Amino acid sequence: MAAAVAGILRGGLPPRAAWLPTLQTVRHGSKAVTRHWRVMHFQRQKLMAITEYIPPKPAINPRCLPPPPKPPKEESGLVRLLRQDIVAVFRDNRMIAVCQNVALSAEDKLLLRHQLRKHKIFIKVFPSQVLKPFLENSKYRNLLPLFVGHNLLLVSEEPKVKEMVRVLKSVPFLPLLGGCVDDTILSRQGLVDYAKLPSLDQLQGQLVGGLTHLMAQTRYLLQHQPVQLTSLLDQYVKEQNEGDCATSANEKLHPPDPAPDA
């Protein structure tokens, strides 16, 4: 092959197509790998696990002591005062409504307070971090889902639901979320339905009218049979008297024949 290359370089003729060089390079394949990975014997695994090196833990510097325990946080006087106010509000009022405390102007807020105060309904605002712990430990815990964000309470000693709903309709941007009336938790729709009920005086009047009607009907039913029996007996006695009078009159008109002499 080297001679052919040298001849080409000297300008000679290229080798013939059938001519093969005397030296040829042959590329052999790689040798087979006989040491493939195999699963380690379980005894060797145990031995390796036992003899595994475990580095020691670094020593703790004695100056790196744990922090001292923090003293229990004492409640401030303001928190205790607010909790007392919350307890008094939920104890002394029969109606407690929850509304979302939206951003109202000073004029709108003053007008709303005035309209509610005419019906003896008052607005109370308490921080959530004081109000929520009280609700969690009281019978009003089901009101907790309503207290999201900033809220305000509409409270009244009497259940003035109808007046409250009428006032809130004039303030559509103050949403009503729910409330509690006479220890009964109601949703927003429940409060609206409660406001549609008639007043207590109307219900008492309807009850008295119904009872009076029932009493009159009962009295009529109790007296109807004796009166009818009395009228029938009077008619019977009258007919008997008329029959006796007719018999006596006939006897007078037609006296009996005298008995013949023997």
From Swiss-Prot:
The keyword Ribonucleoprotein applies. SUPFAM superfamilies: Ribosomal protein L10-like. One of its GO terms (molecular function) is structural constituent of ribosome. Residues 1-28 form a transit peptide. Keywords: Mitochondrion, Ribonucleoprotein, Ribosomal protein, Transit peptide. Transmembrane segments: none annotated. GO terms for cellular component: mitochondrial inner membrane; mitochondrial large ribosomal subunit; mitochondrion; nucleoplasm; ribonucleoprotein complex. It is found in: Mitochondrion. It comes from the Eukaryota. One of its GO terms (biological process) is mitochondrial translation. Residues 243-262 are annotated as: Disordered. InterPro entries: Ribosomal_uL10-like_sf, Ribosomal_uL10_bac_type. Belongs to the universal ribosomal protein uL10 family. Component of the mitochondrial ribosome large subunit (39S) which comprises a 16S rRNA and about 50 distinct proteins. This is Large ribosomal subunit protein uL10m. It comes from Mus musculus (Mouse). The gene is Mrpl10.
